[in-house]
């Protein structure tokens, strides 16, 4: 280890060999990803909808549309058509029309796209989901369209399922009316008149469908009328100040009707926690409205129908009939009544955009 050529102690140039420790042995290279445990077996096939495992391959059915596996309960076959899952059947029943797809739930749209492996992560609107469905719609033959529209009566369960999204749009027929009367209501008036002329007389059974058809059209015509023109309380419409004939009528109003009257006349009811507080504001509004109307009508009677120039300044500059009782914001001009103020998009004086119209009470 030490050089003996001179009296100097010099290190030898060869490194000292360190004997391997006992118990250590050379280990061959091994793959770190290798595991001595047996590889896991493949997942058992299960239904995509309910998650039930298939006991045998006979219960496994493949949807022709989304190509996913379903059980016998979650898939069906309408007539001689292809076997589809229940969700794909609902979409095929719409014939992939935009109007029908917009009526479906967002969850159903997302589930359908998920079955077709289409990501909906960036979709924020329902219309975007409908566009994705329309972009990947399968090819539907004319036979499938007719089968979806007119189903075979031999499959009532499938017919009830496919027509379920549209059941809310069909008005229920009265059980007292016979089936012939229900069919006669769809007959056009021109055809009814031709049948009357051909038969020479009209029976009572033939007159009833025409009468029912005319009565059914009355609510649609009434809905188009203005709310302000109605003078009596009608269920399903908002209450109005013109419905009140006396102060005693205010006591019979509900809390919702009181709030509707205040909201229609631009009176703020925030902070009112009790019903009597709402009644107090409606009473004040009613008295103020009646007082202004009596003031204008009394001045017209004294002057023979003409409004004096002093009171003309207090009349609405739009209708020239009701007194000025609201202020337009943000400009602050008082030139209209409440009825005309809520229809103003811009101030008639300064042409500034109207953000809000607020009812004011005169002292």
UniProtKB/Swiss-Prot annotation:
Inducing factors: Down-regulated upon DNA damage.
Keyword Glycoprotein attached: no
Transmembrane segments: none
Cellular-component GO terms for this entry: cytoplasm; cytosol; endosome membrane; membrane; nucleoplasm; plasma membrane; recycling endosome membrane
PTM annotation: Autoubiquitinated.
InterPro entries in UniProt: CARP1_2_FYVE, CARP2_FYVE, RING-FYVE_E3_ubiquitin-ligase, RNF34L-like_HeH, SAP_dom_sf, Znf_FYVE_PHD, Znf_RING, Znf_RING/FYVE/PHD
Pathway stated in the Swiss-Prot or TrEMBL entry: Protein modification; protein ubiquitination
Entry's free-text remark on domains: The RING-type zinc finger is required for the ubiquitination of target proteins.
UniProt-recorded name of the protein: E3 ubiquitin-protein ligase rififylin
Species name: Homo sapiens
């Amino acid at each position: 280890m030490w050089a003996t050529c001179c009296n100097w102690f010099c290190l030898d140039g060869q490194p000292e060999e360190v004997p391997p420790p006992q118990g250590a042995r050379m280990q061959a290279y091994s793959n770190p990803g290798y595991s001595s445990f047996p590889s896991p077996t493949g997942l058992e096939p299960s239904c995509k909808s309910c998650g039930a495992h298939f006991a045998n391959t006979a219960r496994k059915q493949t949807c022709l549309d989304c190509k996913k596996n379903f059980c016998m309960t979650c898939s069906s076959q309408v007539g001689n058509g292809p076997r589809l899952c229940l969700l794909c059947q609902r979409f095929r029943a719409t014939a992939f029309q935009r109007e029908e797809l917009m009526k479906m739930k967002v969850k159903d749209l997302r589930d359908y796209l998920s079955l077709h492996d289409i990501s909906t992560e960036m979709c924020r609107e329902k219309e975007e989901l409908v566009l994705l469905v329309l972009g990947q719609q399968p090819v539907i033959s004319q036979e499938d369209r007719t089968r979806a529209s007119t189903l075979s009566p031999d499959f009532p369960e499938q017919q009830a399922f496919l027509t379920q999204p549209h059941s809310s749009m069909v008005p229920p027929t009265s059980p007292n009316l016979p089936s012939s009367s229900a069919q006669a209501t769809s007959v056009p008036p021109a055809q009814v008149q031709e049948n009357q002329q051909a038969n020479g007389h009209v029976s009572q059974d033939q007159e009833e469908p025409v009468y029912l058809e005319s009565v059914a059209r009355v609510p649609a015509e009434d809905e188009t009328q203005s709310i302000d023109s109605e003078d009596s309380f009608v269920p399903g419409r908002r209450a109005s100040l013109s419905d009140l004939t006396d102060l005693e009528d205010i006591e019979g109003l509900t809390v919702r009707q009181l709030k509707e009257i205040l909201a229609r006349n631009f009176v703020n009811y925030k902070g009112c926690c009790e019903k009597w507080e709402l009644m107090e504001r409606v009473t004040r509004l009613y008295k103020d409205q009646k007082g202004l109307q009596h003031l204008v009508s009394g001045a017209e009677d004294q002057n023979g129908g003409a409004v004096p120039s002093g009171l003309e300044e207090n009349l609405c500059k739009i209708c020239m009939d009701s007194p000025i009782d609201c202020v337009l914001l943000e400009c602050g001009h008082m030139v209209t009544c409440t009825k005309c103020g809520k229809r103003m998009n811009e101030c008639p004086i300064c042409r500034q955009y109207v953000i809000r119209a607020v009812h004011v009470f005169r002292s």
